[in-house]
């Protein structure tokens, strides 16, 4: 029976979670463009420009602008292909990536003083974006420790996952087919929408068998789910072409 198969997956979940690392730096793109060539050491004037642009509307203390290892690109930046980085980066303009974006540091922020445009975005790094995020696919934002993420504009994407259990992720608005926040375990409708659209290989636990499991589906996973999302992004296979009739029926019953 369909239910029995689902229950079997759920029963294995605790053991599988224990076998995985609590923290990891996720690298989510294939054939990444070397972006070192576009950046140089940030000066005091660059950091002052960030402070003036934000104009005290965001608390910059968690971003530690006084650190010496910030890299900067002055003006708009357009990259042909996928990018990834674990460094502290500032873009004094718009960032347009004709591919996917992956940031795989748990503590090194990205500060963008314009809009960010890409296909898919998976980030472990704290974000401070003065404009909006525009993605034709998925935006997956993980927050760790005490490092918040702030998007002063909107997040526009086909799907949005936000893991904000440990640290807040703030955006002025969102526009998507689904938007799941890990902190809101009662929002089962958006979880159902996500399960209809996302490739099932992007969530290792299989499906779900009751509403209680549905409410916890992202809260109890976060980084483990992020790892599978990374794998599917590398394969350019984040979204399913069409949900199976069995899945449609299963979700309608919840």
State where each predicted segment sits.
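Bacterial N-terminal signal peptides that target proteins for export
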Residues: 1-10
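Absolute N-terminal positional cue centered near the fourth residue
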Residues: 3-4, 20, 99
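Long terminal segments
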Residues: 26-57, 146-254
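Extracellular beta-strand solenoids
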Residues: 72-73, 79, 84-85, 91-92, ...
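Acidic (E/D-rich), amphipathic helical modules within compact regulatory domains
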Residues: 108
């Amino acid at each position: 029976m369909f239910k029995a198969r689902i229950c079997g997956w759920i029963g294995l979940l605790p053991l599988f979670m224990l076998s995985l690392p609590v923290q990891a730096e996720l690298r989510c793109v294939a054939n990444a463009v070397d972006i070192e060539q576009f950046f140089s050491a940030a000066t005091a004037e660059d950091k002052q420009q960030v402070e003036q642009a934000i104009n005290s509307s965001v608390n910059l203390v968690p971003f530690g602008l006084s650190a010496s290892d910030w890299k900067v690109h002055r003006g708009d930046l357009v990259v042909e292909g996928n990018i990834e980085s674990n460094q502290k980066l500032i873009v004094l303009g718009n960032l347009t990536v004709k591919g996917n974006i992956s940031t795989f540091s748990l503590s090194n922020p990205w500060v963008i003083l314009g809009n960010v445009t890409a296909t898919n975005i998976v980030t472990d790094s704290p974000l401070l974006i003065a404009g909006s995020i525009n993605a034709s696919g998925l935006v997956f934002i993980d927050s760790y420790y005490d490092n918040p993420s702030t998007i002063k504009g909107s997040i526009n994407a086909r799907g949005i996952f936000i893991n904000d259990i440990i640290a807040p992720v703030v955006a002025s608005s969102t526009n998507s087919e689904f938007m799941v926040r890990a902190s809101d375990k009662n929002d089962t409708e958006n979880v159902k929408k996500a399960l209809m659209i996302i490739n099932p290989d992007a969530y290792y636990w299989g499906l779900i068998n009751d509403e209680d499991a549905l409410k916890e589906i992202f809260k109890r996973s976060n980084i483990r789910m992020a790892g599978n999302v990374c794998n599917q992004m590398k394969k350019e296979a984040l979204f399913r072409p069409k949900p199976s009739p069995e899945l449609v029926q299963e979700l309608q019953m919840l």
